[in-house]
Amino acid sequence: MEKNFKVAALYCFADLKHYRQLQKPLLDLCQAKDIKGTLLLAQEGINGTVAGSCAAIETLVDFITAEPAFQMPEIKYSWASKMPFHRMKVRLKKEIVTMGVDGVNPLKAVGTYVDPKDWNALIQDEETLLIDTRNDYEYAIGSFQGAVDPRIKTFREFPAWVLKHEADLKKKKKIAMFCTGGIRCEKSTAYVRELGYEQVYHLKGGILKYLETIPKEDSLWWGECFVFDERVSVKHGLEECGRELCRACRSPLNTESKLSPHYEEGVSCDACYNTRSEDDRERFRERHRQFQLSKLRAMHSHQE
């Protein structure tokens, strides 16, 4: 299958006092170049994932890196067979990745970056505690061998988990953390460093860079890596895995999941059926009908 869409996952922490002034120019450029996805702007920097033609993404990256505050953004590229986003959004936020703890600043203190080629040696060290900083539904479909799953629903819950498990953290000399693209670990390692832990490490470029650069036969990764777009998940080589999302709870679904009697497209799946009321499901049905209608209108407008 031909992959025509270039996907860029990017972030950069910076002292960006004028972030509000960047919203309109970024949105205008993306709309002019038919780029779709989401970019978040805050005083602490920029974060997001976007997709478009190769030339369009290059133009956007050139625009972003021309901003003096964004001289060295972390950018990971991959490809998609179809546009993985429905629209373009540039949002203003308090944080570019929400931890909810004031004063955590990766520009001041952060963990030691570990290149993918050196990651296996670190996490196989008996003195290393390996922590997956992602959400529970992400861990459920793939992670590194031996990683601790904090079982959090959102990244906001991570600081409380750390405080609750400090005794476990102190049992090991080293703490290694990882996430999808690296940004959550910028915050999590900065937070743990502020608590007084010194030997704190994180995977440079995140899981995506590891899966891109480490051959499957040498890998300590099992399963798939959840991504926050219509590809849903990727595997070694950043190949798409063919999953879909439950539109009610955003859990990743495979073919077997869709055979469940609790699965209804756009409405429910095994993971959320018992947590929703019938009123909720009826609301989701109406939302799904409206979504399908909007897709039909978009198709007709392109044909005219």
UniProtKB/Swiss-Prot annotation:
A Pfam family recorded for this sequence: Rhodanese
Keywords of the record: Oxidoreductase, tRNA processing
GO molecular function: oxidoreductase activity, acting on paired donors, with incorporation or reduction of molecular oxygen
Enzyme class: oxidoreductase
Identification of the protein by name: tRNA uridine(34) hydroxylase
Domain Rhodanese: 124-219
Active site: C179
Catalytic activity: uridine(34) in tRNA + AH2 + O2 = 5-hydroxyuridine(34) in tRNA + A + H2O
KW Oxidoreductase (keyword) present: yes
Species the sequence originates in: Bartonella henselae (strain ATCC 49882 / DSM 28221 / CCUG 30454 / Houston 1) (Rochalimaea henselae)
E.C. code: 1.14.-.-
